[in-house]
């Protein structure tokens, strides 16, 4: 049986919010923000948002907790819709092997050139920092990993004891 790929329906007047997922993404880092952005279509007074996932494959991504997610787009092969907001959730290897993925880091750099906002949740800040897009702004990460963040990226303006930092188009939490 041949399966037909189902792409998400993207309303042209909405913001496009892409979630960068990889094996080991933590469920709540992805699903809770996805839900919040997706539900903007039910709110009055704010611009609605299209939500979709991007990964380096179209094969299922397995979260740290074992949930399998079919990515909407493969950023290594697909023509992607314009991405207004990139969300980088924390993943199991955000502080180590994911930082060696040059294709992913270059994807982040490329999206940063035109995105309205670049966001991370917890250790998702590490790939943003590795892409050098946080070099001139303040940022933060998961509280128990602040010292690792400071050690790995000593040139950054890192804030601790805060829930989030919003500096220009960059939002880290």
Region locations from a protein language model:
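Short secondary-structure transition/capping segments
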Residues: 131-132, 171
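A conserved active-site-flanking secondary-structure segment within enzyme catalytic domains
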Residues: 135-161
């Amino acid at each position: 049986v041949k399966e037909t790929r189902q792409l998400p329906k993207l309303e042209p007047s909405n913001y496009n919010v892409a979630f960068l997922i990889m094996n080991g993404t933590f469920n709540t880092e992805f699903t809770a923000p996805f839900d919040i952005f997706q539900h903007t279509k039910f709110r009055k007074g704010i611009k609605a948002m299209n939500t979709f996932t991007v990964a380096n494959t179209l094969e299922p991504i397995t979260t740290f907790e074992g949930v399998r997610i079919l990515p909407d787009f493969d950023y290594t092969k697909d023509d992607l819709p314009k991405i207004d907001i990139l969300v980088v959730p924390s993943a199991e290897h955000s502080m180590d092997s994911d930082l060696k993925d040059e294709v992913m880091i270059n994807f982040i750099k490329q999206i940063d050139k035109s995105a309205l906002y670049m966001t991370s949740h917890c250790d998702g800040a590490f790939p943003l920092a590795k892409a050098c897009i946080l070099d001139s702004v303040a940022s933060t990460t998961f509280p128990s990993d602040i010292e690792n963040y400071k050690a790995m990226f000593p040139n950054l303006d890192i804030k601790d004891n805060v829930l989030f930092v919003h500096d220009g188009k960059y939002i880290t939490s």
